[in-house]
A protein has these predicted regions:
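Rhodanese-like catalytic fold shared by cysteine-dependent sulfurtransferases
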Residues: 1-19, 25-57, 63-116, 192
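A short acidic, helix-capping loop that chelates divalent metal ions and anchors anionic groups
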Residues: 29-31, 93, 210-216, 317-319
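Short, structured coil segments at secondary-structure junctions
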Residues: 33-35, 78, 197-198, 279, ...
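A structural preference for short, hydrophobic beta-strand core positions in alpha/beta folds
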Residues: 39, 84, 175, 203-205, ...
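ATP-dependent adenylation/nucleotidyltransferase module used to activate substrates
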Residues: 102-258, 262-266, 270, 293-294, ...
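Catalytic subdomain that performs nucleotidyl-dependent activation
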Residues: 172-173, 251-332, 336-337
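The feature marks non-catalytic terminal segments
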Residues: 304-387
Length: 387
């Protein structure tokens, strides 16, 4: 019996009672699943093999259809009819993209109406509020909206387009995509989604993925730093004075907590920053007040699908295995916040506000402009309390 099954065959199998299983990691699954699939990692799949005996069989998929072959073979050894989806999730995504080509203009209009109406309160309003609260835009700005291809940056681009229609500020936009070494398949996904959403992207290429591929320690951190430098450089070349990144509210509170738990420090992800290496350039984060669950709901309501990271570390099905340290720590922090929220519904807001209500007089030490200040430095200079 053939171990791989084609996309054209799975619909009939599912109608006949087969179970569709997504064996990718949690982070990948957050970016989208094949409708009707059940998330189940490799180890859990084998431990719970017995429950599939009540079904005619199972169809398993991973990112590219490589690791799922081994999983299907393991289940077959337990006498459970199992297939691996040829090409995995990426093959399904390519097929879906092809089906959407003829409906591009209609879908774009629906998505834009949704931002103006259904999603105005949860997406556009907090976007506009962040821009105003943190004074992110001035007349004459030319902003490089940096698009990675994920849900956050794509939504940010649409919200900027909507904000520009309001004409409260006179600013220009460049929708900038850096190709750091994407596979042709992943680049097609980014280009397709940009076309579907009506985002006129400007793509430039770099060799960042090749540069960090051999780095064992913190490749994601180094990649992110290099990417930002390339984005600043290209944005300035295009006449921009600001770059916009798609970090949202949940990124902010997770960063605050991760700094304390894993870094032994208190720091926040700032809503805007002056560049230290590119004079006159600024970084802004206009998604600062938008919740990730609302972004996911927007994505799912509009049947949009995005790749996770699209880098070479996940491109060869490694996303079927455990994530790198940075992703795993962020996922742990995300789960911790969700657990704390069960007993305290204000936990997220309290974490966010904690960096707005810092009492320096109660801090043992703090750093400002690279200089460390200790409470003992001024302790004896202060007026002593006499009871």
């Amino acid at each position: 019996m053939q171990i791989e099954i084609q996309l054209s065959e799975i619909e009939e199998k599912i109608r006949n009672g087969y179970v569709l299983i997504d064996m990718r990691d949690e982070v990948s699954i957050q970016y989208g699943m094949i409708p009707g699939a059940v998330p189940l990692r490799m180890e859990n799949l084998l431990q719970n093999a017995g429950q599939f005996r009540q079904h005619p069989g199972v169809i398993i998929y991973c990112t590219r259809g490589e690791n799922s072959i081994y999983a299907a073979e393991e289940l077959r050894e337990e006498n459970i009819p199992a297939y691996s989806l040829a090409g995995g999730y990426n093959a399904w995504l390519r097929e879906r993209m092809q089906q959407e080509i003829d409906t591009n203009s209609v879908k774009k209009e629906e998505i834009e109406r949704g931002i103006q109406k259904r999603w105005h309160k949860k997406l556009f309003s907090p976007f506009a509020k962040a821009v105003k609260t943190y004074d992110m835009l001035q007349d004459g700005d030319k902003i490089a909206v940096c698009i990675s291809g994920g849900k956050d940056s794509m939504l940010m681009a649409k919200l900027f387009q909507e904000l520009q229609k309001h004409k409260q500020k006179n600013f220009n936009l460049v929708f900038l995509v850096m190709d750091p070494g994407y596979s042709p398949e992943n680049r097609r996904v980014i280009e397709h989604n940009a076309k579907l959403l009506g985002i006129p992207i400007t793509i430039f290429e770099s060799d960042i993925f090749d540069s960090v591929l051999g780095i064992e320690k913190s490749p994601c951190y180094i990649c992110a730093r290099m990417r930002r430098g390339h984005l600043y450089s290209k944005a300035r070349e295009l006449g921009c004075n600001k770059i916009a990144l798609g970090h949202h509210y949940d990124d902010v509170i997770e960063t605050i907590l991760m700094g304390m738990l894993y870094g032994g420090q208190m720091q926040s992800m700032m809503p805007k920053l002056h560049s230290t290496n590119f004079e006159g350039m600024e970084l802004i984060r206009p998604m600062y007040l938008i919740r990730e669950d609302d972004i996911k709901a927007w994505r799912d309501t509009n049947d949009l699908y995005f790749l996770q990271c699209a880098c070479k570390f996940t491109d060869t099905c490694s996303s079927c295995q455990e994530d790198g340290q940075s992703n795993s720590k962020r996922l742990e922090t995300k789960k911790l916040i969700a657990e704390l929220k069960k007993t305290n519904p204000f936990i997220e807001g309290n974490i966010f506000k904690s960096v707005e209500n810092v009492m320096l007089d109660t801090m043992i030490a703090y750093k400002q402009d690279g200089i460390r200040h200790h409470f003992l430095d001024e302790y004896d200079k202060k007026e002593k309390y006499t009871p």
